[in-house]
Swiss-Prot record:
Its main location: cytoplasm. Keywords: Cell cycle, Cell division, Coiled coil, Cytoplasm, Septation. Activator of cell division through the inhibition of FtsZ GTPase activity, therefore promoting FtsZ assembly into bundles of protofilaments necessary for the formation of the division Z ring. It is recruited early at mid-cell but it is not essential for cell division. One of its GO terms (cellular component) is cell division site. This is Cell division protein ZapA. GO terms for biological process: division septum assembly; FtsZ-dependent cytokinesis; septin ring assembly. The keyword Cytoplasm applies. NCBIfam families: PRK14126.1. SUPFAM superfamilies: Cell division protein ZapA-like. Gene3D superfamilies: 6.10.250.790. Belongs to the ZapA family. Type 2 subfamily.
Amino acid sequence: MEKQEKNKISVEIYGHTYKMVGLESIGHMRLVASIVDDRMREMNVHNPSLDSTKLAVLTAVNTVHDNLLLKERLEQLEEELKKLKG
């Protein structure tokens, strides 16, 4: 089995620089970092008194919540598709 080369980049999230390492494309990793940064900034608008650690946790909680809702919706759609196929 051929070992895939890991990509390494530096990204900025909410004013801090982080090193990211992964098998995904650099573009994908930059997109992930950009979405996290955007979500943290959005959370800050509604919760300006939170420090960056609490803001990061709130962002993570909201992101996992959204992910679970999407998984539930996917399961519903898969069930509907099964019924339609008979």
